[in-house]
Amino acid sequence: MEVDLLHFEKKYHNCIVAGIDEAGRGPLAGPVVASAVIVDNANIITGIKDSKKLSKKKRELLYEQITSNYVWATAIISHTEIDDINILEATKKACSIAVANLSLEPEIVLVDGNMQFKDERFVSIINGDNLSLSIAAASIVAKVTRDRLMLDLSAEFPQYLWHKNSGYGTKEHIEAINIHGLSPYHRRSFRCC
């Protein structure tokens, strides 16, 4: 049975609805990125789904379409702030900033996962990136934005292979940390080796 990715957007059809998702909660290095997207229900881009289910090439193509056709905003919280306030609080902060940065103020904000926010507009949806077009679009924008940042950082620190692992704790990444030590972009609060 195919899922109606506009189910939640239709449920709040009289409201401006934003979807929000993050990329980078689990990596050992780099920032956490949250993106918010307001989908234009009269201009549905085909192929949008959870970023993890798309090839890099398809994500890049959809990123260009989403950012050219929909209202969107992104927020980036650095690795140092993650260490200062913890990854959960950093993620929530990035989500709140991304929503605040939208050029339209949403009345409802659909959030992937089970994070709780004080702002009553925020509605958490477990597995939301598979159930909401807005959240799926946000997952693509967040993932592509973060991957591009990690690609830039990889040019400065190629030994960690961030162009391949995006800062996640792959075997090769951990081996590089054991050989070269931590870079300035590694999260000190994440125990990795």
From Swiss-Prot:
Q: What are the names of the required cofactors?
A: Mn(2+); Mg(2+)
Report whether Heme shows up as a keyword of the record. Answer: no
Keywords from the named record: Cytoplasm, Endonuclease, Hydrolase, Manganese, Metal-binding, Nuclease
Amino acids binding a divalent metal cation:
21-22, 112
- Enzyme class of the recorded protein, top EC level: hydrolase
A molecular function GO annotation: RNA-DNA hybrid ribonuclease activity
BP term (GO), one = DNA replication, removal of RNA primer
- Residue span of the signal peptide, if any? none
GO CC annotation: cytoplasm; ribonuclease H2 complex
Q: How is the cofactor bound?
A: Manganese or magnesium. Binds 1 divalent metal ion per monomer in the absence of substrate. May bind a second metal ion after substrate binding.
Q: Boundaries of each RNase H type-2 domain copy?
A: 15-193
Protein's UniProt keywords contain Nuclease? yes
Q: What is its EC number?
A: 3.1.26.4
Subcellular location(s) per record:
Cytoplasm
Family matches, as InterPro entries: RNase_HII, RNase_HII/HIII, RNase_HII/HIII_dom, RNaseH-like_sf, RNaseH_sf
- Catalyzed reaction equations: Endonucleolytic cleavage to 5'-phosphomonoester
Principal place where this protein is found? Answer: cytoplasm
Could you tell me the superkingdom of the organism this chain comes from? Answer: Bacteria
Please name the PANTHER family in this protein's record: RIBONUCLEASE H2 SUBUNIT A (PTHR10954), RIBONUCLEASE HII (PTHR10954:SF18)
Q: Which family does it belong to?
A: Belongs to the RNase HII family.
Q: What does this protein do?
A: Endonuclease that specifically degrades the RNA of RNA-DNA hybrids.
Protein's name in the database: Ribonuclease HII
Q: What organism is recorded for this protein? A: Rickettsia conorii (strain ATCC VR-613 / Malish 7)
Give the gene symbol.
rnhB
